[in-house]
């Protein structure tokens, strides 16, 4: 009886840990929930998508440049999602 109870507890803990890892992974990649805001990390160096929001403030380099989102009103649409303002 004790062995069966022990196995049930171990099985329940294994399920709990598996679901906890999924929650942690979903918090690591906020980019999947929408576009990435200007100044935040993006692109393959960080294992993230390159869909940057346009926050209408930055006037220099545009899109996902050197692993950071930089978008603004003077930027071409390269890598920036102009449908969603940051």
Curated annotation (Swiss-Prot):
Keywords: Amidation, Disulfide bond, Ion channel impairing toxin, Knottin, Neurotoxin, Secreted, Signal, Toxin, Voltage-gated sodium channel impairing toxin
GO-annotated cellular components: extracellular region
Modified residues (Lysine amide): 85
Signal peptide: 1-20
Homology family: Belongs to the neurotoxin 39 family.
Name of this chain's protein: U2-sicaritoxin-Li1b
Propeptide: 21-33
Subcellular location: Secreted
Primary location: secreted
Tissues where this protein is expressed: Expressed by the venom gland.
